[in-house]
Amino acid sequence: MPALVLLGAQWGDEGKGKATDLLGGSVDYVVRYQGGNNAGHTVVVGDQKYALHLLPSGILTPECTPVIGNGVVVDPSVLFSELNGLNERGVDTSKLLISGNAHIITPYNVTVDKVTERFLGKRKIGTTGRGIGPTYADKINRVGIRIQDLYDESILTQKVEAALDGKNQLLTKVFNRRAIEAGQVVEELLTYADRLKPYVADTVLVLNKALDDDKVVLFEGGQGTLLDIDHGTYPFVTSSNPTAGGACTGSGVGPTKISRVIGILKAYTTRVGAGPFPTELLDEDGEALRRIGGERGVTTGRDRRCGWFDAVIARYATRVNGLTDFFLTKLDVLTGWEQIPVCVAYEIDGKRVEELPYSQTDFHHAKPIYENLPGWSEDITKAKTFEDLPKNAQAYVRALEEMSGAPISAIGVGPGRDETIEINSFI
């Protein structure tokens, strides 16, 4: 059975947790392939709400095996905090698998992240301060610590000492901080080894064997397309590849085994942190979207910046991911607006531009060109089929579908697990 990829088609926070959870009952494995605990997703099951940061959403589905792939960076303290929280609420987490090749977020990675952002001041990127970027930097610089290193104290010590050589120079001579003792770091990391061991596996082998055995594997991206280190609004991006290509490198599953790529689109647009955002609303409409949509970051606790739907970035997401379908979320939030503007193109230096500009400078100068679509006032949270939606809501969905370049196969009409309209089956 071929694999599916599910990813954010905007700047993250699109509702991937809801979408993954919806599919969880139909898949055998759910795989996180990049990012770390900088990605937050909320899943509502019955009257229970679960806020996950590192664990795959599939951990809430008993029949599913959740997997943390080699492309993820893992903070063991956060991992065990999430596992403990789920265990206390009666969730069985014993099926979790973690790649031994996944890199560990060390205490010094977190320290470097925080002091760097503080040092940059107004020029800061707006990271979550959780050590994600420095951990990926260590990975690329080949001084990273992998989970498998916890089981060879000699290698672990050598790697920590090598990594701290440069970092202590930075901390003491640039940031006026104390040097970090390698021995203390090694001691702390070794405390996680025994508890991690039951979860550690050769996940590349596990996933490929599962696909050979006709199991259904769902790859779950964190963040969103416009936060991709290569294809996002650089430098205001994350440090990994949430786009579809990252599913392959972050899991060890080849591209020919992926048959469907599903993009999650919010019915409007949000962004957390710094960076360009052409449709951002700094008025009462933006505040209303934030309030009605509950737009506060699961991981950061920061208010999200809100704006109207941007079809230009949706088309871009379709292109760079090879999207086959969209899952549209939070359509219910738009109930009550008489007119709903949709950005169909940009104006840049007096010219109409219908595709995402290649130039960072041009994108910073982009002004949205809107088309107004009629709104609706009816409550849509009880809708079970597309035809149950008000005519104007149907027209809004079809307009977004046409502008974005891929069919909308499911629609979220509320936060609950059952508040979803499935138009076309994903599996």
From Swiss-Prot:
Under the subunit heading, UniProt states: Homodimer.
Q: Which residues bind GTP per the record?
A: 12-18, 40-42, 304, 330-332, 412-414
Q: Please give the catalytic activity noted in the UniProt record.
A: IMP + L-aspartate + GTP = N(6)-(1,2-dicarboxyethyl)-AMP + GDP + phosphate + 2 H(+)
User: Where does the protein end up?
Assistant: Cytoplasm
Give GO terms for biological process. 'de novo' AMP biosynthetic process; IMP metabolic process
Active-site residues are D13, H41
Q: Which source organism?
A: Streptomyces avermitilis (strain ATCC 31267 / DSM 46492 / JCM 5070 / NBRC 14893 / NCIMB 12804 / NRRL 8165 / MA-4680)
List, alphabetically, the NCBIfam families matched: PRK01117.1, purA
**Cofactor binding note:** Binds 1 Mg(2+) ion per subunit.
**Name of the protein in question:** Adenylosuccinate synthetase
